[in-house]
Amino acid sequence: MYLKNIYVSHFRNYDDFQISFQPSMNIIYGNNAQGKTNLLEAIYVLGMTKSHRSFIDNTLIQKNESTAYLKGTVVFQEQSETLELGISKTKKLLKIDHNEIKKMSDYISHMNLIIFYPEDLDLVKGGPSLRRRFMNLELSQLYATYLDVLNDYNKLLKMRNDCLKQYVKGEYVDESYLSILDQYFTNKAELIYRMRKKFVDKLTQYVPEIFEDISGLTGFSLNYHTNIDLSSQVSYQEQLLEKLKKHHETEKRLGVTLVGPHKDDLEFFLNGNHLKLYGSQGQQRMAVLALKLAEIHLFQDYKKETPILLLDDVFSELDFNKRNNLLKHINHNTQTIITTTELELLDTKLIENASLIHIHDGKLISKDEV
């Protein structure tokens, strides 16, 4: 799979911009704050409908404009599709081959993307919500049903929290309604847990070896953390129902649901030590890079497609050996789009085989193709 071209209108610092890419290596270079990261973000938003950098869609729209528009051609298995995304301050318009798509889950996964950017260090250093968001985004691409299940779960979670808030306000709550709600809630919770656990278990087959190849360190591991006893013979749903009963009085007092996948986490360890607490920044960066590169294998295993790899300023913090070790895991079948401020950081052979795209102030200055 590769992105053949993209058109960007009124997005961040891009007014009216279009560019084509080659199926293998593409390098976007230029000084800081010229739009390199914004272009990668535009590609990501076109595929995922949301930004990896911002939770607020309005920030994507160029100042003094009411809408942003993205359009790109994706090529896969000798076929092609045209994706379109319009972003206004109140809604999004999605199209595939000029046909409007109503459900986001029917749109996402038509362009499979893996992105690394400097702030990804927060995947290790930050709070659990960032890691849950990462899993949700990746699983939405891998499994067609995941986003629908997640949306159902979030609706049920909101309904349940609304009931619990009634206790806080001293209002009447129908306990039988809450009991029925709990059955639906725990059913969706188990589906989410199973897909997340399968995702993490599959990553574990690849990440430790990639981490060792890049960093030279052994002993890396991942763990999906949940409050459910995974060794128990009792089903996940039954255990979760029991925990909801156990925490019922506390939840009534606080007005929020205290257990479920919305509280789970993804943990990173090196030789048994929690990387968030004891890892160096370099080790944390290697962990995230290994995680992202392992995802390539998951897409190939599950979807029989190689995803598009977006690497934002990944080389500036790596020494020569680590840069070369990283590049060994990117083969010519993977379309890779890299941003850098310094071409000299890149291997000469890499540059020779790449399309070089020079960006300045949201405009194309030059483009040299192989």
Regions found by a protein language model. Give the residues of each.
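Conserved lysine of the Walker
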Residues: 36
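Nucleotide-state sensing region of NTPase/ATPase domains
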Residues: 48-124, 128-130, 139-142, 146, ...
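A conserved P-loop NTPase coupling/switch region
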Residues: 106-113, 117-183, 187, 366
